């Protein structure tokens, strides 16, 4: 297993030589890897940015089957994941908040309190409306419509779109993992 740095979620590479694993079982190996990563081994969340490379294996004419190769692949991934020191990621959204200039300080303070990064602000002297651009974890945005209405007396609006994934801060990651373990 190797990390992918190109933004891909999953890649499978077959480097088997000499038929150690017959070609008909290679798709079962790939499927076993993908299914295991999709189930998620950290707090039940899918693992992304992973390349799985099949380097070797063995075949037995009686005992080998697609299911056996899927199960063996799944177990191999479960064995290697802890050694890879995986991290919990969270979606980060680009957020644009539109509101009258007089509310910008409170809006930026609120975004910062949500672990957001304010990237900048553009003012329009003609309209009196400003735009704050920020990047904010999705987990912090669940009540943002209500908060923005309160801050701006109903005069603010926002839009958001997915930007990237980033590592969850250590303290929050521990809380998420602990909560998942109590649900199991």
Q: Predicted regions: what is each one?
A:
Residues 1-184:
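Accessory interaction regions appended to the cores of large information-processing enzymes
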